[in-house]
Design a protein with these regions (language model features):
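C-terminal catalytic domain of Rieske-type non-heme iron oxygenases
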Residues: 89, 157-468
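Short Pro/Gly-enriched beta-strand edge/turn motifs at strand-loop
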Residues: 52-65, 138-143, 308-314
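N-terminal low-complexity, Ser/Thr- and acidic-residue-enriched intrinsically disordered segments
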Residues: 2-11, 17, 33, 68
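Rieske [2Fe-2S] iron-sulfur-binding domain
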Residues: 1, 63-186
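Non-catalytic accessory segments flanking enzyme active sites
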Residues: 25, 30-81
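Generic structural signal for secondary-structure transition and capping sites
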Residues: 51-55, 102, 226
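Short, contiguous pre-domain boundary segments
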Residues: 14-34, 198
Length: 468
């Protein structure tokens, strides 16, 4: 650092990670550096060590319901296909031909017992086994060709389900999924317990790309502070809707900021925003509160019916149970481009009337045509554009700092949760500090293990101004 408080261009990635997040309670400073959203060097590290070395969400079992069904997705930069074989077993396989690497399945989903590569005609079973090589008998392959599965498709190192939610990991040395999810399993249980037979993904989805870093969406899904300003149009429209003339009833968005709520930070970067509903009777689940109480007990049923929850399972999915019910999957494409795919989920066996209400509520806020999603995407774009200017180094994350609690608050204890941090209001920002600290730990450990010391210089700025 020079006399002007500037960090030179020769500053390494490891140097920058040391100062990427400030969690200084003594001086009341809580912030993160904006270049963590803009630097391609950080993005490359994220893809390798966060997305391609840890557990990520893949799909829900209900999206591959029948024998020979398949569903395509991604783990970081790696294309993946999930298949259900003729015996009903699920498999997760790298979606790349073992011959020359062309993507094998090029549709989002379908039903096939075998896959033939369009490039050179190799055929594989949906378990990944190589079945046939085009013109193989006259090709003069060496004797070692296709022995002991050498040319089968590559299986994902770890592939597990929790309550029907499917996760995969490319790292053979990763901890078990149950340990990675940790305390968040209790919230996933709340979602899965909404019907005796669990939940299912409703047919159809929306997919869109925004011009911004993936962490903008990860933050925003648990940001209660932005709701009243960014989504004022949604709140105003719902306030003017004529419910007596068959308008779709909605969760009270006008009362969001004044409702009881809070935030939680968990191990491994997971986090959650919750609120207590002011009008829980408008949601389809409310009609089942007595059945839930009988099946689960009142202490477990009450929060399912009376609370909203936006649960971030780091690094790539939100399970949202609020204005409606949604699975939001985040896929980074580049440092400043992100794909989001959203699905509506619902309890299995719910009535046609309840399903219709759920979907109408979903359409009001979500989808690219909804009143919420486009507003968020504009803010992501605006943030990314301004970050590139480097006129200010820091994002302030100190809202609610005097109320943050290490460990569980009263609501968390009632739920049996043990977060590492609790915020007493839904607008508190401490959970972002914890999540970005996890980001730093993962990348720093990777650089130190690599032995390079993060010697790559900063790539996105010539000089970085240190702002006290």
């Amino acid at each position: 650092m020079n006399a002007k408080g500037e960090l030179p261009m020769s500053e390494t990635l490891l140097d920058r990670l040391e100062t990427a997040v400030v969690d200084d309670r003594e001086h009341g400073v809580f912030r993160c550096r904006r270049d963590i959203f803009t630097d391609p060097a950080f993005f490359d590290l994220e893809m390798t060590h966060i997305f391609e070395s840890n557990w990520v969400y893949l799909a829900h079992e209900s999206q591959i319901p029948e024998r020979n069904d398949y569903f395509t997705t991604w783990i970081g930069r790696k294309p993946v296909v999930i298949t259900r074989d003729k015996a009903g077993e699920l498999h997760a396989i790298i979606n790349a031909c073992a011959h020359r690497g062309a993507m094998l399945c090029r549709r989002k989903h379908g039903n096939k017992g075998t896959f033939t590569c369009p490039f050179h005609g190799w055929t594989f079973g949906n378990t990944g086994k190589l079945l046939k090589v085009k013109d193989g008998k006259t090709a003069d392959y060496p004797t070692t060709f296709d022995t002991e599965g050498s040319h089968d498709l590559t299986r994902i190192a770890h592939f597990e389900s929790y309550r029907g939610f499917l996760f995969g990991c490319l790292n053979p040395e990763a901890e078990p999924l149950s340990a990675y999810l940790g305390e968040t399993k209790r919230i996933i249980d709340q979602i899965a317990h909404q019907a005796p037979n669990g939940i299912e993904v409703v047919r159809g989805n929306s997919s869109y790309i925004y011009d911004g870093n993936w962490k903008l969406q990860i933050e925003n899904g648990a940001d209660g502070y932005h709701v009243s300003s960014v989504h004022w149009n949604y709140s105003a429209t719902m306030g003017r809707r004529n419910y007596e003339a068959d308008g779709v009833p909605t969760v009270d968005a006008n009362g969001w900021s004044r409702s009881v709520g809070g935030v939680y930070g968990f191990e491994n970067g997971h986090m959650m925003l919750w609120t207590r509903l002011l009008n829980p009777e408008v949601r389809p689940i409310y009609a089942h509160r007595e059945e839930l109480a009988r099946r689960l007990g009142e202490e477990h049923a009450a929060p399912i019916v009376e609370q909203t929850r936006n649960l971030c399972l780091y690094p790539n999915v939100y399970l949202m149970d609020q204005f409606s019910t949604q699975i939001r999957v985040i896929r980074p494409i580049s440092v400043d481009k992100t794909e989001v795919t959203i699905y509506c989920f619902a309890p299995k066996g719910e009535s046609a009337a309840e399903r219709a209400l759920r979907i109408r509520q979903y359409e009001d806020f979500f989808n690219v045509s909804g009143m919420g999603t486009p507003d968020d995407l504009e803010e992501f774009r605006a943030c990314q554009a301004a970050y590139a200017g480097n006129s200010q180094l820091w994002n302030d994350l100190s809202r609610g700092a005097t109320r943050w609690i290490d460990g569980p608050d009263e609501n968390a204890r009632a739920l049996g949760l043990k977060p590492t941090l609790s915020g007493e209001r839904s607008e508190d920002e401490g959970l972002f500090v914890r999540q970005h600290e996890h980001w730093v730990r993962v990348l720093r450990a990777a650089l130190l293990k690599d032995g390079s010391g993060g010697g790559q210089p900063a790539s996105s700025v010539k000089q970085i101004r240190s702002v006290a």
